[in-house]
Swiss-Prot record:
Signal peptide: none annotated. Disulfide bonds: none annotated. This is Adenylosuccinate synthetase. Its cofactor is Mg(2+). GO terms for molecular function: adenylosuccinate synthase activity; GTP binding; magnesium ion binding. HAMAP family: Adenylosucc_synth (MF_00011). NCBIfam families: PRK01117.1, purA. The gene is purA. Its EC number is 6.3.4.4. PANTHER family: ADENYLOSUCCINATE SYNTHETASE. Binds 1 Mg(2+) ion per subunit.
Amino acid sequence: MGKNVVVLGTQWGDEGKGKVVDLLTERAKYVVRYQGGHNAGHTLVINGEKTVLHLIPSGILRENVVSIIGNGVVLAPDALMKEMTELEARGVPVRERLLLSEACPLILPYHVALDNAREKARGAKAIGTTGRGIGPAYEDKVARRGLRVGDLFDKETFAVKLKEIVEYHNFQLVNYYKVDAVDYQKVLDDVLAIADILTAMVVDVSDLLYKAHLRGDFVMFEGAQGTLLDIDHGTYPYVTSSNTTAGGVATGSGLGPRYVDYVLGIVKAYSTRVGAGPFPTELFEEVGEHLSQKGNEFGATTGRRRRTGWLDAVAVRRAVQINSLSGFCLTKLDVLDGLKEIKICVGYRLPNGTEVDTTPLAAEGWEGLEPIYETVPGWSESTFGVKDHSKLPQAALNYIKRIEEITGVPIDIISTGPDRSETMVLRDPFDA
């Protein structure tokens, strides 16, 4: 039988999923995106060459791998074409390697206009979205008025449906938000110009994945964002609009949940967050600056500087519960090099003095939380690029062991640099 492995983030995104997916796809036949959209930013460094992908799965650079965008992904046609064009200019035959679900909702210009108008109207209470129309596109999906990739097979009917939706959203844009209307004809012309390219890549994803499983193929499911940004389980309302957790694999691809064999949680050796929302372990002074600069903590999608802080093991434990994690991949260990001591958040103290060891569900519940820290010794030696587990400093090994003890999950992979080769695979998920 085949093996289905899920790779997802255990924190607030930006954990280093892209590199790990790219590494593990060496053994995979398919790589599947199952949620999110081009608000993701997955950075791959292969032989020193950097590639940033937002929508196309990270397996696209491997010639023996088929990349799939599942129904749980909201797809911006213009963003997909831009990414395809850039990759094709580098000699990557994207159209031979990429497949799409016809059930993918389309992100169109009115979604982007709504996203930006709403963020502006929220003022100081802005969520910090990427402004790419992700949330409004999911809204249209749930309201059952959204257009999907499959609608492009019938261009005349697509035009009629689009006109109704543009009129609906333009009313809100013009009358409530007092911004310009979206040009229906331009939207229609732009989408129809590339419709045939998109429909040529359409496949029944659920059927494909089921048959792949029966054949014994290895499949990798690539998560975007992170567990604490999940629409249901994250720091609501400072979350994304999709299910970033393991449950999203089944609903976002059509694979039966019993067929998931291993869930790999990517955990950064410290914490980061982009945009607004709770972040109990956030650091503002010298150590925070160290993590930000040494870790190059700037968003691959937005370019925004990420907030940085100590590892929040309470939040990571929540990710263990929700995702039924099989193992961790620890990333950016080298960023902690040179710190005399390292702190791990093992609990929270509420404003009334009560100590808790689980995360609140809504953002309001995080207000006034104080992290309870455990301090461990740091190390002065460099871990950058180390490929042999036994050659890591003893203090680094102790830190790794402590994370395993607190979370109850083994660290199966350790990343010590951005390049694909700078990785230690202690237990391969496809063999676990």
